[in-house]
């Protein structure tokens, strides 16, 4: 939560650190679906897996149905374990330190400014652990990146299951 009525959704590719960010007025399944579509559209490779916290906006049936339909594995982290989502947590900190300190959250242009900053982050900003930009890393890995058909061949819908916010129910359904 950035401010009242202002929430940031963040996706980070585990390997390249490519970043997709968007701002919404609330955390809902509908906004999550919109964000997933945005991520799939903006990432230059097929998405194989979504890892999230256990927020209701991510565990909603509509969200899980879309991921299953698109052949994307859904992997929520354990409750109260934000360290398991470390790359996203770090990316959010970077956005706070490098973007939000420079802008007015009430600006009518906030969404456009965030998109411009995302472009800067992915194409121009050298990432500390990679010593290159996320897009440079992506181009470096492109020859060995699986295409959509290859990723779909690895997806086994029968091995996927529904996740619930209730850990006991999840444990029961896992058996």
State what each model feature region is.
Residues 38, 65, 69, 119:
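Surface-exposed charge patches
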Residues 52-54, 60-68, 74-97, 108-115, ...:
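RNase H-like two-metal-ion nuclease catalytic core shared by retroviral integrases
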Residues 18-22, 76-77:
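Short small-residue beta-strand/loop micro-motif enriched in glycine and branched aliphatics
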Residues 16, 56:
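Short, glycine/acidic-enriched loop or turn micro-motifs at the edges of active sites
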Residues 21-45:
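Active-site beta-loop-alpha junctions of metal-dependent nucleic acid enzymes
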Residues 70-72, 94-175:
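C-terminal domain-tail junction helix/linker
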Residues 1-12, 18, 31-34, 160-175:
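Mobile-element integrase/transposase regions
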Residues 22, 48-53:
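Short catalytic-loop micro-motif centered on adjacent basic/acidic residues
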């Amino acid at each position: 939560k950035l401010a009242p009525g202002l929430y940031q959704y963040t996706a980070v590719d585990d390997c390249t650190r490519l970043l997709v960010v968007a701002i919404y007025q609330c955390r809902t399944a509908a906004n999550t679906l919109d964000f997933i579509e945005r991520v799939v559209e903006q990432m230059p490779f097929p998405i194989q897996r979504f890892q999230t916290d256990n927020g209701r906006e991510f565990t909603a049936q509509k969200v899980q149905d879309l991921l299953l339909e698109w052949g994307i594995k859904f992997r929520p982290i354990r409750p109260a374990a934000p360290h398991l989502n470390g790359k996203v947590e770090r990316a959010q900190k970077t956005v706070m330190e490098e973007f939000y300190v420079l802008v007015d959250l009430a600006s009518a242009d906030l969404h456009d400014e965030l998109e411009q900053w995302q472009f800067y982050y992915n194409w121009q900003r050298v990432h500390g652990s990679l010593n290159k930009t996320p897009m440079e890393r992506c181009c470096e890995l492109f020859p060995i990146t699986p295409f959509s058909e290859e990723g779909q061949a690895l997806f086994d819908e029968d091995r996927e299951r529904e996740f619930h916010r209730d850990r006991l129910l999840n444990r029961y359904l896992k058996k």
